[in-house]
Amino acid sequence: MVIINDIYTFLNEIAPVRYQMDFDNAGFLVGDGGAAVKKALLALDITDAVITEAIELRAQLIVSHHPLIFTPLRHATTDDLAGRKVLTMARHGISAICMHTNLDIADGGVNDALMAALG
């Protein structure tokens, strides 16, 4: 059985979170690290549509490039965009791992892929 922490450990080996830029908030941001993963979604951003798709597909994890929580989350209410997303995901047992600037600068990461594509 694969759990959230297994996937986070694997991703952290490819693009260590310690390499993120100072302003960034990459890493395991929402959820239960011990939860089993049968389905996961990959997204650029965790939008309401992505969360809805995860719910419909009964996914336990969303891995995104851009962080779900970027600035400090001072409250989590349905009146706040980030708070509403976190609450909805928690209610449906969906975790979030976000790999941003650490994936940009990792060997074989986003910057390397862009350079290869551009020649």
Please identify what each model-predicted range represents.
Residues M1-G119:
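Hydrophobic structural segments
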